[in-house]
Amino acid sequence: MTQEGKLEQQFLDYLHSERNYSVNTSTAYENDLLDFRRFLNEQAIETYQQVTFLDVRIYLTELKQKSFSRTTVARKISSLRSFYTFLLRENVIAENPFTYVSHAKNQLRLPKFFYSEEMEALFQVVYEDNETLTLRDRVLLEVLYGTGIRVSECAGILLPDLDTSYQAILIRGKGNKERYVPFGVYAEDAITDYLPKRTELMTRYKKSHDALLVNHYGDPLTTRGIRYCLTKIISKASLTRKIHPHMLRHTFATDLLNNGADMRTVQELLGHASLASTQIYTHVTKEHLKSTYMKHHPRA
């Protein structure tokens, strides 16, 4: 059995043993995987790790040309997204090329981002006072927006990871890949103001660890804890539309591209294994430009 065949079998075993899927459902998943592997062979793509977002778009086009029903296409994409989510969980791949594919309409599902006035409202919340947890939230927001790192990566930052002389942070990303990301003066000032308060809090509760971000008991702030803190900040800012913390990462990438950053640099900063994962943000900026034009130009 090939390595790709082994991965498929591991996934099918997972569906049967952990998800309790029926034989018929597992068979449908297996057929969808086989169909996709035939496509990869035709494209001379040897491994599942080599698949990019653009390959997925080509596959979707092929399914459409074969006149599959919308329901069938939706099922196939759902099967493959689940398979790649499994590979991601098993650290076989670093990025899921099916993440931003909307199977319902065979269109791009564009990442949502914060508008400038929304970012201003968020920052107003974390600069309203200099209490310990407010300073912690200030670091949280400045670092997430200023570096574009994932929430899970932010939770993993240790004090030795901070290189203040170069204004950079060592980040451990997906698949335990390490990268350095720069941070600006706002994040640096926020960290400088926060660290003495962090020390006081940890001393009070007799805690000893290197995690940069701590909760109100001085323990390391978990990924779940960060999401909770961000949700509270968003709530205090009285933002009305549906918002999630990962939008800070989307906003980081979108703002860089809108201000002239090149794609390769943004890819490296985000820690994307494939450039195709970063190219999604060019669609966001184009949509934003179009909507701004349609809204403000007198002859739009």
Curated annotation (Swiss-Prot):
Lineage top rank: taxon: Bacteria
Pfam families: Phage_int_SAM_1 (PF02899), Phage_integrase (PF00589)
Keyword Cell cycle: yes
Positions of the Tyr recombinase domain: 109-294
Keyword Transport attached: no
Cellular location(s): Cytoplasm
Keywords for this protein: Cell cycle, Cell division, Chromosome partition, Cytoplasm, DNA integration, DNA recombination, DNA-binding
Annotated GO biological process: cell division; chromosome segregation; DNA transposition
GO MF annotations in UniProt: DNA binding; tyrosine-based site-specific recombinase activity
InterPro entries linked to this entry: CB (IPR044068), DNA_brk_join_enz (IPR011010), Integrase-like_cat_sf (IPR013762), Integrase_catalytic (IPR002104), Integrase_recombinase_N (IPR010998), Integrase_SAM-like_N (IPR004107), Recomb_XerC (IPR011931), Tyrosine_recombinase_XerC/XerD (IPR023009)
Active site residues of this protein: 150, 174, 246, 249, 272, 281
PANTHER family cross-referenced by the UniProt entry: PHAGE INTEGRASE-RELATED, TYROSINE RECOMBINASE XERC
Primary role: Site-specific tyrosine recombinase, which acts by catalyzing the cutting and rejoining of the recombining DNA molecules. The XerC-XerD complex is essential to convert dimers of the bacterial chromosome into monomers to permit their segregation at cell division. It also contributes to the segregational stability of plasmids.
UniProt record similarity statement: Belongs to the 'phage' integrase family. XerC subfamily.
Name of the protein: Tyrosine recombinase XerC
Lineage, uppermost ranks: Bacteria, Bacillati, Bacillota, Bacilli, Bacillales
This protein's encoding gene: xerC
